[in-house]
């Protein structure tokens, strides 16, 4: 059948006015055809009906009640960047920033002093944390969306580069903490607690990865390690790790980072939890959102 194509927003050069396309043809095939004609990557193209309903991949025109002669609106989303690349850039920032501070702290603070053991351990924990995140971004995580607008990269990186990078580094490695002391047994407890939280977070990410086969967008109810108590144990263990970190560093900046990060994760978790309840009628109602037995 013949459908009409029209640009939504900025005019798309070389977009054909009409196209012969079967009613049961997949939206993926439609994207490929329009991409080949306009020479725009498929990730830049978004299709919608006249009422603004977005045409999703792995669906057909028939699903949206599109008939012969109907108008399909095509929007150019602009330059895109892969989500995997976004995550890698986000986590690279703190790694570079903390390394810069640890190598140049005397020059940065204009004072001759030596870092205490707590500060050195804090540096190691930060580096291990974000190296783990880089590893997960490359080898573990599967992304439901392939790309995001390139213009959003600065906004996405701000939290990690500024808050967990510059903000944490400046206030953790400063001379005001150079004489901090924690009893060895207390220090060992905090390190072991941090390691437990980080490894538990990694374990939950592996469980989530294994729930979705590669190339699939299938969604199922997660179970197992932590998931029987809360919907998002990965967020809980992430917050727990930063709690141990804040106790170790004794820095008010670490507590602010813990609060801001945990609050943001709870907002995400609350929305996703509501989606679980709506999508799965048999979803366990006893599960809390993020904090076991409480919230």
UniProtKB/Swiss-Prot annotation:
Pfam family, one: Steroid_dh
PROSITE patterns linked to this entry: S5A_REDUCTASE
Transmembrane spans: 85-105, 158-178, 187-207, 224-246, 251-268
Catalytic activity: a (2E)-enoyl-CoA + NADPH + H(+) = a 2,3-saturated acyl-CoA + NADP(+)
Keywords of the record: Endoplasmic reticulum, Lipid biosynthesis, Lipid metabolism, Membrane, NADP, Oxidoreductase, Transmembrane, Transmembrane helix
Cellular component terms (Gene Ontology): endoplasmic reticulum; endoplasmic reticulum membrane; mitochondrion
Intracellular or extracellular location(s): Endoplasmic reticulum membrane
EC number of this enzyme: 1.3.1.38
Topology Cytoplasmic: residue spans: 1-84, 179-186, 247-250
Coiled-coil segments: none
Ranges in the topological domain labelled Lumenal: 106-157, 208-223, 269-295
GO molecular function, one term: trans-2-enoyl-CoA reductase (NADPH) activity
Signal peptide: none
Gene Ontology process terms (BP): fatty acid elongation; very long-chain fatty acid biosynthetic process
InterPro entries cross-referenced by the UniProt entry: 3-oxo-5_a-steroid_4-DH_C (IPR001104), SRD5A/TECR (IPR039357), Ubiquitin-like_dom (IPR000626), Ubiquitin-like_domsf (IPR029071)
Keyword Nucleotidyltransferase: no
Membrane topology: Multi-pass membrane protein
Family the entry assigns: Belongs to the steroid 5-alpha reductase family.
Protein name (Swiss-Prot/TrEMBL): Putative enoyl reductase C646.07c
Lineage of the organism: Eukaryota, Fungi, Dikarya, Ascomycota, Taphrinomycotina
